[in-house]
Amino acid sequence: MNIAWAKKRGNRVLMYGCGIGPVSSPGNRRAAGRIIDKYVDAITLRESHSARELQDMGVTHPKITVTADPALLLDPAPAEAVEAFLAAQGLDPARKHLLFVLRPWPGFEEKMPLFARAAEEYYETRGLVPVFFALEPKRDLPVAEATAALVSCPHHVIAAPHDGHLIVGMMGKMEAVVSMRLHALIFAAGLGVPLVGVVYDPKVSGFLDYLQETRYLDLETVAEDTLSALIDDALAQGVNGYSARRLRALAEENEQAARRLLEEAP
């Protein structure tokens, strides 16, 4: 209703850097499609799956542009601030680290030992110290702590700071990121850090498909060998600077769309 109210008050309406869905109820899909089509002037989307969702909802009036998530433009904190944060968490800057970003979800508990075994495997074979990172601490910290409790090698559990720039900077220090959380994957992609996605929701696979990123698997299909194969592949790739620059350029198109809408004659 905020969209309709804004338009009725004479404002131009831009849906900025959105992901659409899932909206499963037929009635809700019709209602959402009708409101968006009637009251929105332009939409920028973070991946192509959302464009298909809008098309299926019957949205044809607004100008739709597939760009990338605006979070990709979040710059890392200064190096000294990142190093101070990691030191405060007990991380040795001389060691290399593998980041796990896990979250509660139905079916996760039975897969938890597989993530713990992967953490131990890469410590034993590559010397990568596992870091279990709670991106949304209130929800994710119990999962991070429970997984870490299954690990016998040296490891760290970190709750995300409030400073997003610090989060991005920390991720830039990782050898690879294994994540269920979409925004951890977005941050890693924006930095070019090798990533492995664990999909619990179509928005995660939609983002990775848009990146043409094949290193992901559904949570229910996680197995020791398949998870290890994807992590091996990610580590072999190394940092992808070209991909990071391309994504940031796409994310900047959100701002360009907003500027165009403001400059249009009423």
Model-derived regions: residue spans:
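Active-site anion-handling motifs in enzyme catalytic cores
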Residues: 1-266
